[in-house]
């Protein structure tokens, strides 16, 4: 929403050489600033005590003991409730997703509603004649024993696969479009912005969004679209944290405490999605809270929520194997120093993947906004049909991505040369015919290229969509293809561990698309338990990060989406060239000198009128408080600053009718205690910030930026010799910073408009051919 200054007839100060940042509101880098409310972290810290003090005083006699007990237990009750709900939703998502995916290939003989894991839970191993916990790659025994019925025939399985894929995608996109539009996409970018101090639309973390995201996400994944659940898991987990804290801590919730709960919940979302609790905690530190100080309190809350959430998930046991990890992989053959060049090559691939896939995805998002925004449902149906049609004939694309990676990560032969896996990938040796080798190698390469392209066009469609697992799937097929070449032409069989190459490739692409390092390393270890490959993994991730850094990419896909969508976000410090440019400008040039001010003494009726008039006309969000004796002066002295939301809350607490409001005086410089029992007088001193952050006119913009980032304030007063000159807001300085970047370096993202028009012409021609008859009428 607009900044806190508005034009009035009598501006304060001369306003010479002021840069009007509002004229740049419509540039892409700032297009959605008005959808966010800047949070004044300093002012928010005092809100609960000041606004609720009267109510607390009146009720303290009756609620004292209950409140003491609640005060001691509320943190753990809130954290535990949040974690348990997140764990339950994660268990539901896993079971529901697997059920829908399995329906595309068969059904349970005794109960159609059971997925393959539950249906085959009691399968008897023909070798040991014992009932084992089902392992992903032992499911063929379930079919052999008649517990699971696969679709038979040559055409029927294909038709069922296609129909269910399109149906699942259709239901998912309809739910998002017509019921909860905020449930679309990943949600990580918006959460990062929210945590950094810019509050988004309340519906984004609302109950309806939580429900639809939890239902539409498994439908989208089951449709076969190249989307993952990890990003949306962060979103639904954050919804849980937000809703439960608002409900349980509504009387004492401040921004800083809410930030801690939201960060902890987001980390738990990653923890339950990957089965990686420590990785989830690190994700909250490295990704979500990167623009904020991650203190020990936040770290502890993140740890506790991840612990309880993952314990809840283990109790539910959605995989029916007693574990919470996606892949049960063990590598007992150590790596060799001679393999380091190959590890470096995998890291280079991960860096290039992150660079180009994010770039192409951003270009396609621009194309979608320009030409496809009116047909979101049709776009999803087309993508689902295309994906299913291509994937059906390739094993590594047809399978669910996590199941496919389970195959690719698996170790074929142990150190004693005994086979642990019967997949055809493990039947290749020096005696394998070249045609068979090329068939599997080509299948892996095809899956790599097609999956990467599908990620480009699928991420951002009108369904819940993550990009972590699809990127890992691309890296896994590439890494396994590389291992085939190494075994065939360099090392020979039984020397390297092919599954480890898939594992390292997945880590490379995950790091490439997210630009995360420590988080990726820990998540990959928790996913697989492959601790023997810690050094190769660190090499791969380091090389990936080096490639991204040398390419000028400083953030992952979430950070780039923030810029693409024009969200406000206080980025890390600017480079030297940008800092030198900003040093030339001062607060005087950036500030707004046209303000609405409030005198320290004012009638309640005037205050109400000013409050609601500003709401309708200007959407002002704060007011400087000035001395009474300066009421008719051009130069005013500022004694404080009050947020509009605090002012509205305080006025609502007053039991004053409209007639009495005309004679009731409000004192911003006195409290009710100071006024005593004076009739028709109210003290508002408790909601006024008596020491707002202020600077001189000559302060450089670079210093202002650091103040906003480190202090977390919403506005900074510009004064000179005690005289109020203007205001600078966080959005002002962000607009200015991005404007100057655009002037010096050009647009952050450039698009080939001519190519977009040609592509749209082709698409439009095809659509027209299939939707009109010979007479030109729509079919």
Curated annotation (Swiss-Prot):
Keywords, ordered alphabetically: CBS domain, Chloride, Chloride channel, Endosome, Golgi apparatus, Ion channel, Ion transport, Membrane, Repeat, Transmembrane, Transmembrane helix, Transport
Parts forming coiled coils: none
Membrane-spanning parts: 76-96, 155-175, 178-198, 204-224, 265-285, 297-319, 337-357, 370-390, 437-457, 466-486, 501-523, 530-552
Ranges facing Lumenal side: 97-154, 199-203, 286-296, 358-369, 458-465, 524-529
GO molecular function: voltage-gated chloride channel activity
Site (Cleavage): 136-137
Post-translation changes: Proteolytically processed in the secretory pathway by protease KEX2 within the first extracellular loop. However, both the N- and C-terminal products of the cleavage reaction are required for assembly of a functional channel.
Family: Belongs to the chloride channel (TC 2.A.49) family.
Protein name: Anion/proton exchange transporter GEF1
Organism from which the protein derives: Saccharomyces cerevisiae (strain ATCC 204508 / S288c)
